[in-house]
UniProtKB/Swiss-Prot annotation:
Family: Belongs to the phosphohexose mutase family.
Catalytic residues of the enzyme: S102 (phosphoserine intermediate)
Native source organism of the sequence: Allorhizobium ampelinum (strain ATCC BAA-846 / DSM 112012 / S4)
A Pfam family that the UniProt record links to this protein: PGM_PMM_II
InterPro entries given in the database record: A-D-PHexomutase_a/b/a-I (IPR005844), A-D-PHexomutase_a/b/a-I/II/III (IPR016055), A-D-PHexomutase_a/b/a-II (IPR005845), A-D-PHexomutase_a/b/a-III (IPR005846), A-D-PHexomutase_C (IPR005843), A-D-PHexomutase_C_sf (IPR036900), A-D-PHexomutase_CS (IPR016066), Alpha-D-phosphohexomutase_SF (IPR005841)
The protein's name in its UniProt record: Phosphoglucosamine mutase
GO-annotated cellular components: cytosol
Biological-process GO terms, alphabetical: carbohydrate metabolic process; peptidoglycan biosynthetic process; UDP-N-acetylglucosamine biosynthetic process
Modified residues (Phosphoserine): S102
Cofactor binding remark: Binds 1 Mg(2+) ion per subunit.
Length: 450
């Protein structure tokens, strides 16, 4: 079934433009309440948000929908996505909601839903919600005496801070480390600096003055230049860049070099393998992770299981096959020993633990392998299915044959835009560039792409 509302990470769009409107948000609350009311107990929802201006509007609309359907609502205020997942479990809620568009600009927003176990909702439950949202008849509301109550939860960020601190091994403190952290003017602007300081670090913070409009604006994990500058300026031992909802992280070493999610997963996997706490015999990543990571892990006797793009697919594979490390090159790192979703701060603490235990610098710890040349380009299409064209399929087969064991080819349609993404990687950069350019030409000229 073609989905109208839910994408790969909940419902997302530009604020006050369908589907990210207050009337739809209210209807989401009523639809979820309609499904939950099939049980017999009083139901509870927790709602968190990042710092976008539209967050207040959407939060209020969701509260109206949930309470109208007879659900009680706990409001967490600005708080990271992984905190919502954690508090959904801790507060014994039936549903957790995060109002955020992650690393996107302030004008966008989204609604992510978590089940009582802290994991994102199943495809089947999202489809059930979709069906109710598409229903023309009014959804049933609670009787007057059964309308839900809403209240602000005091101290929720401190519960999360204590949770984060407990993920650092007890034999490790951060004393003696100068840490620069960029909170992206987002959801972690209070919790991240506080947690690091309470663990003993000297903390220099940027991106901690949200005004509703500046989330992810030239800051955070997708714009690390400001953090690189700050690391040099204060001679920090490490820089930590979070995104707007703090579910992803990028590290900057003491020289100012960027460390992406692939390198971070390599560090954590090697450390946990040495401690004999790694599960599954390897890690889970997406098809976009660098071939260098796969080779590095293979050299350690570990495997790399690949999934489709999206942390949802990574987490699903981890759960089904009992892995405890997974993630994406972009910095979504999922450590299932601690949580159910990507958590930038928790992942950063595992890197800091490796630094403290070895006595080495971040640059010595974090650059575990040399990435092979990787090239990603997009082809804009106006319709059709060019990947089903016989000429395109033959060109792809020829390219895969040419790369053989010396590289990889990933070609996939974008999930959000009319684009075909072409990624190739291998040891020979000139070969990679030629293959990608040739494939772009074939796809663009396909009759199916017109």
């Amino acid at each position: 079934m073609t989905r109208r509302y839910f994408g790969t990470d909940g419902i997302r769009g530009q604020s006050n433009v369908f589907p990210m409107t207050p009337d739809l948000a209210m209807k989401v609350g009523i639809a979820v309440g309609t499904i939950l009311r099939r049980g017999h107990h009083r139901h509870r929802v927790v709602i968190g948000k990042d710092t976008r201006l539209s967050g207040y509007m959407l939060e209020t609309a969701l509260v109206a929908g949930f309470t109208a359907a007879g659900l009680d609502v706990f409001l967490l205020g600005p708080i990271p996505t992984p905190a919502v997942a954690m508090l959904t479990r801790s507060l014994r809620a039936d549903i957790g909601v995060m109002v955020s568009a992650s690393h996107n600009p302030f004008a966008d927003n989204g609604i992510k839903l978590f089940g009582p176990d802290g994991y994102k909702l199943s495809d089947e439950l999202e489809a059930e919600i979709e069906a109710l949202l598409n229903q023309e008849a009014p959804l049933p509301l609670a009787r007057a005496e059964d309308i839900g109550r809403a209240k602000r939860v005091d101290g929720d960020i401190y519960r999360y801070i204590e949770f984060v601190k407990r993920t650092l091994p007890r034999d490790v403190t951060l004393s003696g480390l100068r840490i620069a952290i960029d909170c992206a003017n987002g959801a972690a602007y209070k919790v991240a600096p506080t947690a690091l300081w309470e663990l003993g670090a000297e903390v220099v913070t940027i991106g901690n003055e949200p005004n509703g409009l500046n989330i992810n604006l030239e800051c955070g994990s997708t714009h690390p230049a400001a953090l690189q500058k700050k690391v040099h300026e204060v001679r920090a031992d490490i820089g930590i860049a979070l995104d707007g909802d703090a579910d992803r992280v990028i590290i900057v070493d003491e020289t100012g070099a960027i460390v992406d999610g692939d390198q971070l997963m390599a560090v954590i996997a090697e450390s946990w393998a040495n401690d004999q706490t790694l599960k599954g015999g390897g890690i889970v990543a997406t098809v976009m992770s660098n071939l260098g990571l796969e080779r590095f892990l293979g050299g350690k006797g570990l495997t790399l299981a690949r999934t489709k793009v999206g942390d949802r697919h990574v987490v699903e594979h981890m759960r089904q096959n009992h892995y405890n490390i997974g993630g994406e090159q972009s910095g979504h790192i999922v450590l299932s020993d601690f949580g159910t979703t990507g958590d930038g701060l928790v992942a950063a603490l595992q890197i800091l633990a490796a630094v403290k235990r070895t006595g080495k610098t971040v640059s010595q710890i974090c650059h575990r392998f040399d990435p092979v040349p990787q090239l990603l380009r997009n082809v804009r299409i106006s319709g059709g299915k060019p990947l089903e064209d016989s000429f395109v399929r033959q060109a792809i087969a020829d390219a895969e044959s040419e790369l053989a064991r010396n590289g990889r080819l990933v070609i996939r349609p974008s999930g959000t835009e009319p684009l075909i993404r072409v990624m190739a990687e291998g040891d020979d950069r000139s070969q990679i560039e030629r293959i990608v350019n040739d494939l772009i030409g074939v796809i663009a000229n396909s009759r199916e792409a017109a």
